Structure formats: C-alpha cells, structure tokens
C-alpha cells in the first residue's frame, strides 16, 4: 500500500503498462493499492531522473525509510531525497485524509503500547498479548513501523 491506509482494493502496475508492456504480468510489478492512490494519484505516472533511473521508491526492493521520514505527531511524510520527494508527490502521501488518519493512529497506537507495557509489568501477559494482536489490525501500519524504528534511534 502506497499511502499506508489499509483500504487496498486495487492492483497497480508499479511501472505502468504504457511504459513497460513487458512487465504487465511480472509479479514484482503488481502492488496492492487503494483505488484513490491507483486511479486518482499515480495513474500512469512513473517519473524518472535525467539518466532514466526511476524516481519512485520501490518498497519491494529498497527501504522506504532511506527516502522518507514519517513525522508521527502530524502524520506527514518528509522527503529525505529526490526519490522521496517524487514518491510523496505522485502518491499524494500528505493528503489531509492521510495525515489526519496517521496522527490519530499515532495517538491510538501510543496509548495501546503504553497499556501493553503496563500489563507486562503487572504480570498480565494474556491481556498484553491481546493488545499486541489488536495492533496488527490497526490502520496505517506505517505509523507502527515508524514508531518501532524510531524507538531504536539514538
């Protein structure tokens, strides 16, 4: 999912068929996307640098966090590279509906993680495990991923 929301209901050809017809049936070119990202944002866009290198971050081949930083409290992505900038623009990653959703998801997940930690400390592993399981089904998985990643940074 490009936007991180879990409303995937479309299959996108990452490299558009019009630009790469031989990749039409290439499994590595099929991405789950929400219909908004696929139809209204990306469409047939696939920007390239002057040397022909694709500018969109391919999350199946590289770590998006090398090009993007999620500002958790406001739910916005910040570009760390030209490729990150192109990815934000093409997919509309900072659309209001997404930034609000990520900000709310951050508050919710932070609260759930605090509750989980408290339950572990109180010796209640069963309820802590229930919270862990519920985190798997929260929208905006990119928020939880960023929280866990940033937790390990100095």
Model regions: which residues?
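C-terminal, charged low-complexity interaction regions
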Residues: 88-154
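Conserved, surface-exposed functional patches that form binding/active-site neighborhoods
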Residues: 45-118
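Histidine-centered nuclease catalytic patch
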Residues: 2-32, 41-55
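Surface-exposed loop/turn and secondary-structure junction residues enriched for glycine/proline
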Residues: 17-20, 28, 59-60, 71, ...
């Amino acid at each position: 999912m490009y936007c991180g929301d879990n409303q995937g209901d479309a299959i996108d050809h990452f490299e558009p068929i019009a630009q790469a017809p031989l990749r039409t049936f290439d499994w590595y070119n099929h991405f789950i996307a929400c219909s908004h990202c696929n139809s209204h944002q990306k469409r047939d866009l696939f920007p390239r640098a002057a040397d022909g290198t694709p500018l969109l971050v391919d999350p199946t081949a590289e770590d998006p966090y090398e090009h993007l930083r999620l500002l958790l409290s406001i739910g916005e992505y910040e570009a760390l590279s030209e490729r990150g900038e192109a990815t934000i623009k093409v997919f509309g990653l900072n659309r209001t509906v997404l930034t609000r959703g990520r900000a709310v998801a951050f508050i919710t997940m932070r609260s759930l993680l605090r509750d989980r930690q408290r339950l572990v400390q109180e010796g209640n592993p069963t309820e802590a495990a229930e919270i862990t399981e519920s985190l798997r089904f929260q929208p905006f998985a990119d928020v939880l991923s960023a929280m866990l990643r940033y937790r390990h940074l100095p």
